[in-house]
Amino acid sequence: MDANMNKILKWSIQNSTNASSDQNAAADATSRGLTPEMMATLFGGPSDADLMKASMEALRSDEVDLENKLVAFDNFEQLIESIDNANNLEPLGLWTPLVELLRHEEADMRRMAAWCVGTAVQNNEKAQDKLVVLNALPTLVAMSTSDPNPAARKKAVYALSSAVRNYQPAMDEVAKHLPEGYPRGEKIDAADMDAVDGIMDKLRAHPVESSA
């Protein structure tokens, strides 16, 4: 893992775990009219783009244990709640590695990857289109109907729900890959929230064979 990225990741983790001790300082700075961006510049903190790249480096590193990878994933998810950061996934080259993590051997990693995908594409047509281009929707459908981990399945449905709403190309792609018993041969209106909710509710209740 790149040394600079490692330092940034440590900075991010320390700031997320020590947030309570820094509240007074942050409040003082805010009361003086300093924005978070100005504070980052003044105190030399890394940019959101730096933190996003550092998190992904950690997620792909063999030197980072699962516990710290989940911390990095949590930080990553919070960062991409901002639509500007979500739209930076593409120029930063982070979409492809994020989608690849949907197939990770660790259930918690798959769960967090799906969660991040769902957060990034919510009410974001640019990101919704990226899922279609990357052919990630069939993976999410398979994950929502066959992943042995219930929490991972739940987040996969969340990602699908965010991906298809009000974006017809994603809805059409998902419809092609739904299992038998779903409305695969008919047009589903991505703007029809009742229709979308019906499919998502059915996916949440989809029976999964026990791996035992």
Swiss-Prot record:
Keywords, comma-separated and alphabetical: Cytoplasm, Repeat, Translation regulation
A GO molecular-function descriptor: adenyl-nucleotide exchange factor activity
Residue ranges of ARM repeats: 23-64, 83-122, 125-165
CC annotations in GO: cytosol; endoplasmic reticulum
Major localization listed first in the record, in broad terms: cytoplasm
Signal peptide extent: none
InterPro entries: ARM-like (IPR011989), ARM-type_fold (IPR016024), Hsp70_NEF-Inhibitors (IPR050693), Nucleotide_exch_fac_Fes1 (IPR013918)
Compartments it resides in: Cytoplasm
BP-aspect Gene Ontology terms: cytoplasm protein quality control by the ubiquitin-proteasome system; regulation of translation
PANTHER family per UniProt: HSP70-BINDING PROTEIN 1, PROTEIN FOLDING REGULATOR
Function: Functions as a nucleotide exchange factor (NEF) for Hsp70 chaperones which accelerates the release of ADP. Required for fully efficient Hsp70-mediated folding of proteins.
Similarity comment text for this entry: Belongs to the FES1 family.
Protein name: Hsp70 nucleotide exchange factor fes1
